UniProtKB/Swiss-Prot annotation:
Pathway(s) the chain acts in: Protein biosynthesis; polypeptide chain elongation
One GO molecular-function entry: translation elongation factor activity
Modification N6-(3,6-diaminohexanoyl)-5-hydroxylysine, positions: K34
Protein name, as recorded: Elongation factor P
Entry similarity comment: Belongs to the elongation factor P family.
Length: 188
């Protein structure tokens, strides 16, 4: 594997820490008035999402991870695995529940996703930023039954539950922000 010095470490770079891929979220090069320079960095493990802060000497090296982000299309789920296809090469890969990283509740089929591959194996799936899903179950909203802004839970066709405004009804299609899991708009 390739290694890079601490002078070449940048935000967004993917590295290996204890044989696990991580992405650097923050770096700060510190040169104190007395003593040796060092780099303080924060990184997030791709698989678990755990964030760790580490300080390293300027002479240390880090190992670059063989991690590739690939645009792929979600095809289907067979209950145990989720299947994706590269639209250019038609190569198919599958991942389990751990590799989905919570993206499974936003995918119904034929969505374009970013799949992170490590040594050819999917370890993380990023769904599209916005998805349009149909509401399968929600209570009818009655005007005046709230003391604040109001909202009600709605179950979507994928099984996800989001809070929606009172004017949204069952069988309507809504736009959901997958990054926050919040209602965005009603689709006409």
């Amino acid at each position: 594997m390739a290694t890079v010095g601490m002078n070449d470490v940048k935000n967004g770079m993917k590295i290996l820490v204890n044989n696990e891929p991580a992405v650097i979220t923050e770096t700060e090069y510190v040169k104190p008035g007395k003593g040796q320079a060092f780099t303080r960095m924060k990184y997030r493990f791709i698989k678990s999402g755990r964030v760790v802060e580490m300080t390293m000497k300027a002479t240390d090296d880090v190992e670059v991870a063989d991690v590739v982000d690939t645009d792929m299309r979600y095809l289907y789920s067979d209950g145990e695995y989720w299947h994706f296809m590269d639209p250019d090469t038609f190569e198919q890969v599958q991942t389990d529940k751990a590799g989905m990283g919570g993206a499974d509740k936003w995918l119904k089929g034929e969505e374009d996703c970013i799949v992170t591959l490590w040594n050819g194996t999917p370890i993380w799936v990023q769904p599209p930023n916005f998805v349009e899903l149909k509401i399968t179950e929600t209570d009818p909203g009655v005007r005046g039954d709230t003391s604040g802004g109001g909202g009600k839970p709605a179950t979507l066709e994928t099984g996800a539950v989001v809070r929606v405004p009172l004017f949204v009804n069952q069988d309507e299609i809504i736009k959901v922000d997958t990054r926050s899991g919040e209602y965005s708009a009603r689709v006409k």
